[in-house]
């Protein structure tokens, strides 16, 4: 039996019924075969439902990693926060006039990455150091890591 299942966007473009069936199948395969699963997805709803630990990537680099509950309760990296705030959460007809939040700008080309933090050009919190140096992934809270100078400094204060 395989020890690892790598599922790359297994629920993309599927309706919620089929999506639930796919996630159930992955879960049962995991349990039946006692294997690990790496689930690659852009769907935060799938992450919230199916993941235990999560790593958020931006422009090919991990910018935050944590267990899923901590990540959704307290996103530390501005990109993660932007992703969470830009998804529809319990929208109803009453708030149909509200616009979803967006992350300004565009993802940089992997051939022309900025010299500092890859998210710095789109980040509302970016400082000079963010544009000059690449932040390392550091433990900000127990078991919760982020690659962000601003989050690291805020945790120290």
Q: Can you describe what each PLM-predicted range is?
A:
Residues 1, 58-59, 122, 142:
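Residue-level recognition of short loop/turn positions
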Residues 67-157:
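Charged, flexible cofactor/metal-binding loops and thiol motifs
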């Amino acid at each position: 039996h395989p020890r690892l299942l790598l599922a790359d966007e297994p629920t993309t473009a599927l309706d919620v019924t089929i999506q639930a069936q796919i996630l159930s199948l992955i879960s049962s395969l995991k349990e039946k075969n006692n294997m690990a699963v790496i689930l690659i997805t852009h769907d935060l709803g799938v992450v919230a439902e199916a993941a235990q630990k999560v790593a958020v990537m931006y422009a090919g680099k991990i910018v935050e990693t944590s267990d899923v509950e901590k990540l959704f309760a307290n996103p530390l990296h501005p990109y993660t926060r932007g992703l969470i705030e830009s998804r529809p959460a319990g929208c109803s007809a009453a708030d149909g006039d509200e616009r979803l939040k967006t992350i300004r700008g565009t993802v940089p080309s992997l051939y022309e990455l900025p010299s500092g933090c890859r998210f710095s050009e789109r980040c509302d919190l970016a400082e000079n150091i963010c544009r000059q140096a690449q932040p390392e992934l550091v433990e900000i809270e127990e078991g919760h890591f982020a690659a962000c100078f601003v989050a690291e400094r805020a945790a120290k204060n």
